[in-house]
């Protein structure tokens, strides 16, 4: 395996709860109104220090999307997913953006969203936007 290069973020950021690797800046939050199977999730315009899994079509609360799960590049922990393609016209704004599950990341003030509220049947991507 080659040398691992990490992007260091300047400013308030969200990081992996397992290894504290920077994942996204607070300034890159698009929406805090998303829901995942474990509870709250935030939509970000830019996420760093992650690698993507296999593309798959997934039916979510807002319709069919092509997504990839994303993992921390340092420790390999699942942290959320990235939207590759939205089938519905009104969901196109999500393309290229990533969702981080709050219970999988540390917040900018060092807190973690520990409450895992189970949501029925698969992934959710409800938002108020």
UniProtKB/Swiss-Prot annotation:
This protein's name: Protein yippee-like At3g11230
Residue sites binding Zn(2+) per the record: 16, 19, 72, 75
GO molecular function, one term: metal ion binding
Matching PROSITE patterns: YIPPEE (PS51792)
Pfam families: Yippee-Mis18
Domain Yippee residue range list: 12-109
Keyword Cell division: no
DNA damage keyword on record: no
Keyword terms: Metal-binding, Zinc
Similarity section: Belongs to the yippee family.
